[in-house]
Amino acid sequence: MTTNVVLAAAIALLAAPAFAHSTKEDVIPAREATLEASPAEIAMRFDAAMRITRIALTDGDGRSFDLERGDGMAPVTEFAATPEALPPGDYTVEWSGIAEDGHTMSGAWTFTVR
């Protein structure tokens, strides 16, 4: 009986990394950053491949801005999109995606252009 419990615990510990979800490691522009000029790119880095299914950039008035993405919806660990030139204001980036394990994820962050 004790052997079965130890064996089950060992299997659970070894399998845990296989079920871990991807996490967002970094974003550009940085969260709550204040920029002197429009950013050259909107980017995210993940610890495991992620298929970004939606990325949106809006200003404080809810107006949408186009983002040109170059990944073709392929799973990536580094995602980047090029925004049009942004006028001064507050901006929100919202995204959603699907991790390699099928788990859906989403998030948002803000930045300001002076």
Q: Language model features by range: what are they?
A:
Residues 43, 47-112:
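Acidic, low-complexity Ser/Thr/Gly/Pro-rich repeat segments typical of extracellular/periplasmic
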Residues 10, 15-17:
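N-terminal signal peptide c-region/cleavage motif recognized by signal peptidases
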Residues 1-7:
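Bacterial N-terminal signal peptides that target proteins for export
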Residues 7-9, 26:
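Short helix-onset patch at the extreme N-terminus, typifying the N->h transition
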Residues 20-55:
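N-terminal non-catalytic regions of secreted/periplasmic and cell-surface proteins
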